[in-house]
Amino acid sequence: MDNYQELAIQFAAQAVDRNEIEQWVREFAYQGFDARRVIELLKQYGGADWEKDAKKMIVLALTRGNKPRRMMMKMSKEGKATVEALINKYKLKEGNPSRDELTLSRVAAALAGRTCQALVVLSEWLPVTGTTMDGLSPAYPRHMMHPSFAGMVDPSLPGDYLRAILDAHSLYLLQFSRVINPNLRGRTKEEVAATFTQPMNAAVNSNFISHEKRREFLKAFGLVDSNGKPSAAVMAAAQAYKTAA
């Protein structure tokens, strides 16, 4: 009979081959959202106009969603022409395509700094409006009103501060998830949170933007002070999430 304990010990004693492991990491790499690749594709397809086009795509993502063909059905003639041009120029897809394809949501997430700034202007055109959020927590921070905000969160903040920011952001995600997914409307807070916690944490812990730059963004947004302490509005939203149903 095999001695499985001994086999496990012998296996652990084998030398670690760094090159072999790195090769496997490349082979098994997640073929989904990659902010660097998104920006690379934007520049490749858009040339000198990529930044202006990206701004348009962010507005579309925030106000109309991730399905450009469907949104064109109810849009002005000028708007349809603009969206059609973007679809053709950037080969925009819907759903969850390969790593080397663009969607409106991916553009908004990759350029989260710009997306969060646009939210201040567009908050009343979102699926869950700023007015609605103010009803849940006074002066709810507009910069937090999109899933891409998680990419701006500095994970090196002190634990209590980090938790408060994530809870405040989760207050929006809770409402947003129930609006865009009817199947979640009768679910508990914990059940709904289970659908957005993993992608939120993945964005927080990504290495695309440094901790220092993220902290600068949070300060510029008025969400934390020079010590990383959350603002009163953030703390109020965090408390509202804790007591939300």
UniProtKB/Swiss-Prot annotation:
Residues of the site described as Important for dimerization: W125
Subunit structure, interactors included: Homodimer. Homohexamer; ring-shaped, necessary to form the nucleocapsid. Homopentamers; opened pentamers in solution. Binds to viral genomic RNA. Interacts with glycoprotein Gn; this interaction allows packaging of nucleocapsids into virions.
A Pfam family assignment: Tenui_N
Entry protein name: Nucleoprotein
RNA-binding in keyword set: yes
Impact reported for R178Q: 75% loss of 30transcription
Chain residues that bind RNA: Y30, F33, N66, K67, R70, R99, S105, R106, R185, T195
Family according to the record: Belongs to the phlebovirus nucleocapsid protein family.
Coarse class of the protein's main subcellular location: virion
Keyword line: Capsid protein, Host cytoplasm, Host Golgi apparatus, Host nucleus, Ribonucleoprotein, RNA-binding, Viral nucleoprotein, Virion
Function: Encapsidates the genomic RNA, protecting it from nucleases. Displays high affinity for single-stranded nucleic acid. The encapsidated genomic RNA is termed the nucleocapsid (NC) or ribonucleoprotein. The ribonucleoprotein has a non-helical structure. Serves as template for viral transcription and replication. After replication, the nucleocapsid is recruited to the host Golgi apparatus by glycoprotein Gn for packaging into virus particles.
Localisation: Virion; Host cytoplasm; Host nucleus; Host endoplasmic reticulum-Golgi intermediate compartment
Outcome reported for the amino acid change (mutating R178E): 90% loss of transcription
Domains: entry comment: The N-terminus is involved in homooligomerization.
GO CC, alphabetical: host cell endoplasmic reticulum-Golgi intermediate compartment; host cell Golgi apparatus; host cell nucleus; ribonucleoprotein complex; viral nucleocapsid
Region (Essential for oligomerization): 1-71
GO molecular function annotations of the record: identical protein binding; RNA binding
